Every structure is written in C-alpha cells, then in structure tokens.
C-alpha cells in the first residue's frame, strides 16, 4: 500500500548548499530561516497557540537525496565514511522514504510564517508536518547511544583583523551573522573567509524592512521577505 503526502510549506534557509549544513540541529544556533506555509495552512488558524512554544519538531523531506532504490546500509559521516551501518541505526540523509526530522527554536510566529533558528535545513526544504516540542515527553533522562555518545568536537576559531573585516563585509552582503555561524559550526561546516569582491552593503526595502540585523533570514534573493518587492542596496562602512 502506498500513501501520498504533500508539503505544508518550504524552508527559506541560510544554507544554500547541502555540503555546508550542520549534521544536527542546534549545532549552529545562529543559523536562521523562515518556514513559509502553503495554503490552506497560511491563514494563521493552523499556528494559533504555537506562540506559547519555544521549540518545534519539523518533519521534512531530504529533497536532494531522494532515491528510487532504498539503501539498506549507509556510511555515516560520524564514522569517517569508512564504516557502513544499517540505515535505521543512523541519521543519514538517505532514508527509505526520504523523511527527516529536526528540533529547532521557534523565534517568532506569524500567519503563514514561522521564524526559526538553530536549523540544519537546506534552502527550499519541503516540510511535511510541524509538532511542538514537549520537554517532559521528549527528554529521556536515561537514554544512551553508543554510536554517538558525545557531541562532535569543536575547533577553536582565531580571527585575524583581516578575517574579521571580510566576515563583516560578507555578513552585510548575505545578511547573516557570518562570525557567529563560523564560530558555532561543527568541524564539517567551517570555512575560511574569502576576500569580498564588492563593497559592503546592506539590503533594504521600500517597505522599511531592514534585513541586516543578524536575526533575520538571508536577503540573497530577488525580493523582500516582507512585501516581495525587489530590494535596494544602502552602502555601509565596515565596523571593526
């Protein structure tokens, strides 16, 4: 028997490429995104009461890892990609039905939009369902996992003055807190800042929305998040 499911919305994420995404949610608290709900879930009725919740579970599709033939064994990155395990013993993206789940922080609730942080989702990810995180039920005090018994190791990031300047410029261009993202990322997601080829600028819209506050989703798209109008650039001076 087969079942058909349809997305209730899509995530607009700061992660545009799958190879830069943290392996688990909450590893990069500064990673932000917006879940844009589709009709009929975009009227506000479906999210009424959700403002009382701090975190939510997102059930989603690994839309860039869907396969016709299911894999019985996978090579999880945590084991260096050299050891295979049964797919059900891992959180690998290659799932029998392409389903994933992440618990993320709910920053703000609006009709048709949920503002999120601590995400590990690719831009455009289809979301199948939303469920509130319930601490007394979702926390299992005596749970254990011998495969992943500790968080991934962190690598200290030492910023030179030039790297800080570049991070600031890229942060303004991308409307993302680059320094915080790099500092909170897991080893797989760390990247060396590169020289900017354009002057730093902030993206603003005629509707008055400013997107370079470090708390809003990226403006690396052709329209404003609020009113869907094309953005304009406003030059800013770098801050050390």
UniProtKB/Swiss-Prot annotation:
Q: What is its EC number?
A: 2.1.1.-
Example GO biological process term?
Answer: methylation
Q: Which residues bind S-adenosyl-L-methionine?
A: 22-24, 63-64, 91, 122-125
Q: Which residues form the TsaA-like domain?
A: 5-142
One Pfam family, please name it: TrmO_N
Top-level taxon in the UniProt lineage: Bacteria
**What GO MF annotations does this protein's record show?**
tRNA (L-threonylcarbamoyladenosine(37)-C2) methyltransferase activity
Return the InterPro entries for the record: TrmO-like_N, UPF0066_cons_site, YaeB-like, YaeB-like_sf, YaeB_N_sf
List UniProt keywords, sorted A-Z: Methyltransferase, S-adenosyl-L-methionine, Transferase
Q: Which family does it belong to?
A: Belongs to the tRNA methyltransferase O family.
Name-wise, this protein is Putative S-adenosylmethionine-dependent methyltransferase RcsF
What organism, scientifically named, is this protein from?
Pseudomonas aeruginosa
């Amino acid at each position: 028997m087969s079942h058909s499911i349809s997305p209730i919305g899509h995530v607009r994420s700061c992660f545009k490429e799958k190879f830069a995404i943290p392996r688990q949610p909450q590893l990069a608290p500064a990673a932000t995104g917006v879940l844009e709900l589709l009709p009929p879930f975009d009227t506000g009725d479906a999210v009424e009461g959700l403002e009382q919740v701090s975190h939510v579970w997102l059930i989603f599709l690994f839309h860039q890892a869907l396969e016709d033939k299911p894999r019985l064994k996978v090579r999880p990155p945590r084991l260096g990609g050299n050891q295979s395990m049964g797919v059900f013993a891992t959180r690998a993206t290659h799932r029998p039905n392409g389903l994933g789940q992440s618990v993320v922080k709910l920053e703000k609730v609006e009709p048709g939009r949920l503002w999120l942080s601590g995400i590990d989702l690719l831009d455009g990810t289809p979301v199948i369902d939303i469920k509130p995180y319930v601490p007394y039920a979702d926390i299992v005090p005596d749970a254990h996992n011998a495969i992943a018994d500790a968080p991934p190791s962190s690598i200290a990031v030492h910023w030179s003055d030039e790297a800080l300047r570049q991070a600031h410029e890229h942060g303004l261009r991308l409307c993302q807190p680059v320094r915080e993202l790099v500092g909170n990322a897991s080893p797989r997601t760390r990247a060396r800042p590169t020289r900017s080829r354009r002057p730093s600028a902030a993206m603003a819209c005629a509707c008055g929305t400013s997107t370079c506050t470090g708390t809003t989703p990226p403006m690396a798209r052709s329209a404003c998040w609020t009113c869907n109008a094309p953005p304009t650039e406003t030059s800013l001076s770098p801050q050390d």
